[in-house]
UniProtKB/Swiss-Prot annotation:
GO terms for cellular component: cytoplasm. Substrate binds at R73, G74, G75, K76, I77, T78, W79, H80, A145, I146, G147, G158, F159, S160. The keyword Nucleus does not apply. SUPFAM superfamilies: Class II aaRS and biotin synthetases (SSF55681). The keyword Ion transport does not apply. It comes from Salinispora arenicola (strain CNS-205). This is Octanoyltransferase.
């Protein structure tokens, strides 16, 4: 399904292998760079896969030989899979390119999405992503991860929002290289089902906040 506004095309790709999604990202990126296509966002789920960003250390990886795909985004290792909504914004950033400001816009968009579901989430100084603050249930917990790259002024990679995924997949790795915090999902925090299908229209409604600022 494709939704287009005057500024942004949103492509719902269903479930897509990581390599196929990466190929589509690169195709869209080239089209945006060469002005053949306007800003676009891919929204999808992946089959279970681990991906390692450029700052991943050997000890962050699974110890049991689980396959890992090395990618050219920032950040460290993470997991993608069923029950997690992944977004790949392919956006031309205004000059001068401010990567930190873009990451903050992505974070705020996801914070606003969480708020619509009734979950209070925010930022932690020095750490990217969106977090549920420490409370009597435990330390701070990441509900959404962000890892991006900017090439020729246009973004690649993006964000992942844990909806109702199996959180035990994170037990094999040091997610995003952070040992002193946890990982969570909308469903785990709210105590009710929140599926990718539930999250899709909410995320889609907030995506225009990423464009043109």
């Amino acid at each position: 399904m494709t939704t287009t506004t005057s500024d942004l095309t949103v492509l719902r790709a269903g479930t897509l292998d990581y390599e196929a999604a990466w190929e589509e990202q690169r195709r869209l990126h080239e089209s945006v760079v060469t002005d053949k296509h306007g800003d676009a966002v891919l929204l999808l789920e992946h089959p279970s896969v681990y991906t390692a960003g450029k700052r991943t250390e050997p000890w962050d990886r699974p110890m049991d030989g689980t396959p890992v795909i090395d990618v050219d985004r920032g950040g460290k290792i993470t997991w993608h899979g069923p029950g997690q909504l992944v977004g790949y914004p392919i956006l031309r950033l205004p000059d001068p390119v401010d990567v930190v400001a873009y990451v903050r816009r992505v974070e705020q968009m996801l914070i606003d999405v969480c708020a619509e579901f009734g979950l209070v989430a925010g930022r932690i100084e020095g750490r990217s992503g969106v977090w549920v603050p420490a409370d009597d249930r435990g330390p701070a917990r990441k509900v959404a991860a962000i890892g991006i790259r900017v090439a020729r002024g246009v973004t690649l990679h993006g964000f992942s929002l844990n909806c109702d995924c199996d959180l035990t997949y994170y037990d094999r790795i040091v997610p995003c290289g952070i040992r002193d915090a946890g990982v969570t999902s909308l469903a785990a925090e709210l105590g009710r089902p929140v599926t990718v299908a539930d999250a899709l229209p909410v995320v889609e409604r907030h995506l225009p906040t990423l464009v043109g600022a």
